[in-house]
Amino acid sequence: MALALIHPSKRAYSLAPLNLKEELQGFKVQGDRKGVGQEPLCKQFRQLRYEESTGPREVLRRLRELCRQWLRPETHSKEQILELLVLEQFLTILPRDLQVQVLEHHPETGEELVGILEDLQLDRGKAGEQKDSAQRSRPTVLVGEPAPRREAREQPGCALPQKPEERGKETRSENGNLIAGTDSCGRMESSCTMTEPIEAQCEDLSLKKNPAMPKEKTNSQCLETKERLVQNSGLIEHDRAHTGEMSWESVGSQSSVAADHQEISKDKGHPCQECGKVFQRSSHLIRHQKIHLGEKPYQCKECGKVFSQNAGLLEHLRIHTGEKPYLCIHCGKNFRRSSHLNRHQKIHSQDEPRECKECGKTFSRALLLTHHQRVHGRSKRHHCNECGKAFSLTSDLIRHHRIHTGEKPFKCNVCQKAFRLNSHLDQHVRIHNEEKPYKCSECNEAFRQKSGLFQHQRHHHKSKLA
């Protein structure tokens, strides 16, 4: 039976949820897979060996099992399985360095993978152009020649002091002035009248060669402001203020900044036609366009909530599974999102709690205090249609609605008990894990909930609390 194919341009928006992140992790370099336990199913299917099984029937059964676990035909359509196979083979034939760079962006469709590769090729081309331009702009230096002599070679009218063995014949007039001379190779060197800036540069070069020689103070006068300067080199720098001339150092630095700015503006070359937002990579633009199209192909099988990106679905599934992969190294507490862990870690770095000036309530983080202060400064504009109760935040109204609807989206994986709030599920899971994080500082008795610790302290340590 032939597979029904769809156009590649539409496939990126019409595919149902594919949990590609799990499959794509199998293509990472072995050096990046430290600490990973089980091999991905696609690699187990590809690398199964006949010698590892007891017989041909066992090999066939194992291959069918691995293929079904990998492709999941009971949940995926033919188009989805085809897309998964094409994407897997595409990643397999990529060079190793490109595999690593592509997997950092977590492509979800073949179109996104192509967009990522095109962006990488564009970046490599720009890097090569920058390297070539840097080599072309680098000044040519004569090897084996001292720096002062190279500077003098660039100034034809400036002659360096010659060594005795290098001096040729010199022709002088009757009054002793040098008319022409020959160098050690026999070439004629004609005299010329040097301008004042070149004389100043020759003077600086002679001082570099003979640092012990005292430098005479010469009074130079600016023709514009009649200001007198001690050295001719100072007059050169002073004249640039009137003429607007820039030294080669400042010109080079400003041109490099302008070039960097142009490169940045070139990178942002993928604008959204709907809202005008610009993206550096075409793959990012493809993901962003799903917002305007209203496409939410990734649906949660537990509660039916839909998402525009597969990453959002994977993050949402942690609510139902109870998975909290982000661990705080200070207190051992786990979190579902990395942003929650970052906010939590600020508790350990702060010594003093933050207090609300309106009601005196204290908070461990400034963000919680800001969130709480909205209660005092904002009117309760969100009313419940069932009981008329008002709330200042829409999130509080949504949580309150679950009381009337009876919705309990947070389910325990062990006993299947459902809860209205995620915090209630966290407290319930401690029963199965036998976790008691709240410990009495007086007698070291532990409790699962903070309220149990408070009741214990009021009854058994009432005198010490007073």
UniProtKB/Swiss-Prot annotation:
Q: What is its main location?
A: nucleus
Compartments it resides in: Nucleus
Q: Where is this region: Disordered?
A: 124-182
Q: Where are the zinc fingers (C2H2-type)?
A: 220-242, 270-292, 298-320, 326-348, 354-376, 382-404, 410-432, 438-460
One GO molecular function term? Answer: zinc ion binding
Covalent cross-link Glycyl lysine isopeptide (Lys-Gly) (interchain with G-Cter in SUMO2), where: 21
| The organism's place on the tree of life at top rank | Eukaryota
Q: Where is the composition biased (Basic and acidic residues)?
A: 124-135, 163-173
InterPro entries, alphabetized: SCAN_dom, SCAN_sf, Znf_C2H2_sf, Znf_C2H2_type
How far does the signal peptide extend, from start to end residue? none
| Domain called SCAN box: residue spans | 42-124
Under the cellular component aspect of Gene Ontology, which terms does the record hold? cytosol; nucleoplasm
- Cross-referenced PANTHER family, in alphabetical order? ZINC FINGER AND SCAN DOMAIN-CONTAINING, ZINC FINGER AND SCAN DOMAIN-CONTAINING PROTEIN 23
Known function: May be involved in transcriptional regulation.
User: Could you identify this protein by its name?
Assistant: Zinc finger and SCAN domain-containing protein 26
Q: Which organism is it from?
A: Mus musculus
The organism's lineage is: Eukaryota, Metazoa, Chordata, Craniata, Vertebrata
